[in-house]
A protein has these predicted regions:
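C-terminal helical cap(s) of enzyme catalytic domains, especially alpha/beta-barrels
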Residues: 12-29, 67, 81-104
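Glycine-rich phosphate-binding active-site loops on the catalytic face of alpha/beta enzymes
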Residues: 2-11, 56-57, 62-90, 134
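Feature representing long, continuous alpha-helical segments
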Residues: 38-41, 45, 74, 89, ...
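Glycine/Thr-rich beta-alpha phosphate-binding loop at enzyme active sites
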Residues: 1-49, 83
Length: 147
C-alpha cells in the first residue's frame, strides 16, 4: 500500500456574479517541495507503508532529493501536464546521470540515505536546524534589504 502525503485538494474559485464555483487547475511548483521532503524524511523507515511524494517535483534533482529523503515513488503530474510526456524522459535521464556521477549503484542505495533515520546530521530536521539558519543570516534576497 502506498501513502501519498500532501495530495492536493481540488480548489475551485468562486464567480461572484454567477455565484457559482469556477473550476480551476493550478500546477504545483518548487515552493511546495520542501515541506514534502521534510515529512518524507521524518516518516521514512518509521512507518510500514510505502511513501509517495506528491507535489513540487519538476526536475531530476527533485526526484533525487525525494528518493534520498525516503520516498518510494515520486509523482510528476504537474511537470507532465505542463511539458508533455517527453518531460519524463528528461527527468529520468537526468536522475540516472546524477546517480551515476555521484557513485550510486542503484536507486535502492539512494533511497532513504538522508532520511531522519539514516542522516549523519539529524539536527537539520529538528528545531535546532531552524535556529541555526536564523543565526546564520542566510535569508532569501528581498527588495527592501538592498539585495
Amino acid at each position: 500500500m502506498r501513502h501519498v502525503l500532501f495530495n492536493r485538494f481540488y480548489q475551485p474559485g468562486i464567480d461572484p456574479v454567477t455565484r457559482a464555483p469556477v473550476p480551476q487547475l493550478r500546477y504545483s511548483d518548487a515552493s511546495e517541495l520542501l515541506l514534502r521532503l521534510y515529512w518524507i524524511a521524518i516518516l521514512a523507515g518509521r512507518v510500514r507503508p510505502s511513501l509517495a511524494l506528491s507535489g513540487g517535483a519538476h526536475e531530476p534533482l527533485d526526484a533525487v532529493n525525494a528518493l534520498m529523503a525516503g520516498a518510494d515513488v515520486v509523482q510528476l503530474v504537474s511537470a507532465l501536464l505542463k511539458d508533455g510526456p517527453g518531460r519524463l524522459t528528461a527527468i529520468r535521464d537526468g536522475f540516472t546521470r546524477w546517480g551515476d556521477e555521484h557513485g550510486f549503484a542503484s536507486v535502492g542505495e539512494m533511497r532513504g540515505c538522508v532520511s531522519l533515520s539514516n542522516c549523519h546530521h539529524p539536527e537539520g530536521f529538528e528545531r535546532a536546524g531552524y535556529v541555526n539558519v536564523l543565526q546564520s543570516g542566510r535569508f532569501p534576497a528581498t527588495p527592501w534589504a538592498g539585495h
